[in-house]
């Protein structure tokens, strides 16, 4: 007794998508926001980049490895300098409008808040490590880097405030 063979009929539907399709927009050209640099947050980001560059180059040009505390200052200064340049590029090219999946106001608040706290600690460490008795040859560079570290800290505090205002206005809506 053989069972009759039934015709197998299965419908299979497949779709193909790519990760890049989720981030595509209608235009392929980059936008450029000229007005961003004229805003106070834009000005503060440029100031953070310039002053942060001064902080780590003034230390890097010395024999900072003799004072272990300057390792922390160098880490914070270089790390946040690179990330701030990255964020400036994102803001100027308006890349944040092309990636709406990222909560940019929250990212900005977390970035600026952490930069403020860590730069404040680095500035205090920098200032407390400067001593003319320790190394008179590097004293001026280290003292100047300490001064600029506090200025960068003030800039990050300002951007933290503006990021908080933007974040709060997004969460209230």
Curated annotation (Swiss-Prot):
Span of domain MARVEL: 36-168
GO biological process: chemotaxis; myelination
Transmembrane segments: 40-60, 70-90, 105-125, 147-167
GO MF annotations, alphabetized: cytokine activity; structural constituent of myelin sheath
Tissue expression pattern: Highly expressed in liver and pancreas.
Listed GO CC annotations: cytoplasm; extracellular space; membrane; nucleoplasm
InterPro entries the record matches: MAL (IPR013295), Marvel (IPR008253), MARVEL-CKLF_proteins (IPR050578)
Record keywords: Chemotaxis, Cytokine, Cytoplasm, Membrane, Nucleus, Transmembrane, Transmembrane helix
Superkingdom to which the source organism belongs: Eukaryota
Matches recorded under PANTHER family: CKLF-LIKE MARVEL TRANSMEMBRANE DOMAIN-CONTAINING PROTEIN 8, MARVEL-CONTAINING POTENTIAL LIPID RAFT-ASSOCIATED PROTEIN
Similarity comment text for this entry: Belongs to the chemokine-like factor family.
UniProt name for this protein: CKLF-like MARVEL transmembrane domain-containing protein 8
Organism annotation: Homo sapiens (Human)
